[in-house]
Amino acid sequence: MVLPEPTSRLTFRLMETADLDDMTAVLSAFDPVRPGRRRRTRDDAVRWIEWQARNYAEHDFGLWVVETHTGEFVGDCGLTMQDVEGTAHVEVGYHVMPGMRRQGYATEAATAVRDCAAEHGVEHLIALIRPDNTPSQGVARNLGMHLERTVWRQGGDALVFGRRLQRAAQNR
């Protein structure tokens, strides 16, 4: 199983059923950037965890639980396969607990995930982001991503940020 390397503040582990309460909290949290978004339920969190188990089995990656080195739950971050206009892409995605936002955790976790993707042969990485979600656009830019196009997805526009990746050995 692929797992990103720990960072100076964060660790990654597989998501499991025992994470249901934490995942419900992060997925159902009010998002001031998207106040009209339907808030997810505990049942949604169950399906989310089940989806990660399928991702781990099918792709050897998924969204991983992100914690501080002291074990405090930060959220999730990882890789998923996404169909964008009929083409499969690897996407970096994340959710951060409201009280943990604006502390650089999303960028730190997503950077480790980006580097893990590159080390495991992912050649192109995307992030699908709603136009009004400027904080996530900032994270994508911090990862070296650029706006590639806008697509219609799940009832609204989505910005497709992306970048080419290279293994570290190829950069030398």
Report the location of each language-model feature.
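Acidic-and-aromatic substrate-binding clefts and catalytic sites of carbohydrate-active enzymes
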Residues: T41
